[in-house]
Structures are given as C-alpha cells and as structure tokens.
C-alpha cells in the first residue's frame, strides 16, 4: 500500500492577552478574522498540513491564554514544542516589554534539551491599527531585542488584513522542522474498506 510520510510539528504561541494570538492562528489556518474579542481559556490548538521539499508536515499550533492565572498550565502544553512564537502588539509597549518574561517562562517550563539554540520567532502584530499612527514599538526596537536574544526572526503582521501572516508561519514551520528529531508518521494514501482497513482519524487540518 502506498503511504505518505507526515511529521507532526508542535508550535506554541505566547504573549499577553489581547495581542492577537488567536486571530493570527485563525487567519493562517482558516483565512478568517473576527473583530469580536474573546479571551482564550486555558489553551486551544488548530492544525494545518504544509508541504516543504515534497514532504508533508502537520503543524499543530497551540494558542495559550495570556492571563497569569492560566500560566500554571504551561508545563503540560509547552513540553514537546518544536518552536515558540512570541507575539506583541506594536501599539502596546507593555506587551513588548513582557516578551522576555514569556520567553524565560517557556524555557523554564518546556525545558528544551538545548535552550540556547531553541527556535523562537517574534511577531509584532496589529500594524494596521490607525494606519500605523498608534504604534509605540518601532521595528528597529523590536529587531534590536531579537538580535540580543540570538538573532530571533522577526515579522510585522496584521491578523486582520492577513499581512505577512503566511510568510511568518512559513518561517515558523521551517524553524520547527530544524528542531524536530527524525520521527515520521506513515499514513496510508487510501483506505481499502473491503479488506477491513480502518479509516484514519481526522487531524482537523484545513487542507
């Protein structure tokens, strides 16, 4: 039976409440945006199948709550992550200042085997707000912080308009892939019901 090789890549999105983590994830996976804000309770995730160099990968993107009272949930959700995405709102300085706290918390709770080289990606979201007139975190400032932490890739995004979202997540996926050990999942291309083959469980991917 023909089979496809698919690798699961786990990505964690962290940042203060309201910076647009859920919106970025929904824009990338579902091509949808909602103006109605609803705080994430605990954690949630979406999956998307992507392909690089004739290989299939399933991105499992975890959106965690930014509220302090849920941070104790971190250990269970952070463990096994292949890449961590840190998001701030370019219009809210506090959300940028807190990036270091989120980064440190992830490293403590996830306990990656090589913390010095663990892949992070930083997103400066909501660049569309007020035509950019409300922003208080400059691109230069954000890039300088990323450089000081080991040259973390940086993207400015708008979840609302879809600006730079695909490019950012392609970088995220490629960085996650570099960190993933060589473990592959073999999935059948077709299911022969007559021979008693079991249907494959849906991954929830938006393919």
UniProtKB/Swiss-Prot annotation:
Cross-referenced SUPFAM superfamilies: P-loop containing nucleoside triphosphate hydrolases
GO biological process: protein transport
Location(s), subcellular: Cell membrane
Family matches, as Pfam families: Ras
SMART domains (alphabetical): RAB, RAN, RAS, RHO
Cysteine disulfide partners in this protein: none
CC terms in the record's Gene Ontology section: plasma membrane; vacuolar membrane
MF terms (GO), sorted A to Z: GTP binding; GTPase activity
Residues at which GTP binds: 15-22, 63-67, 125-128
Bilayer topology annotation: Lipid-anchor
Keywords, comma-separated and alphabetical: Cell membrane, GTP-binding, Lipoprotein, Membrane, Methylation, Nucleotide-binding, Prenylation, Protein transport, Transport
Cysteine methyl ester sites (modified residues): 207
Lipidation (S-geranylgeranyl cysteine): 205, 207
PANTHER family, per the entry: RAB FAMILY, RAS-RELATED PROTEIN RAB-7A
Record's function text: Protein transport. Probably involved in vesicular traffic.
Name of protein: Ras-related protein Rab7
Protein source organism: Gossypium hirsutum
Gene: RAB7
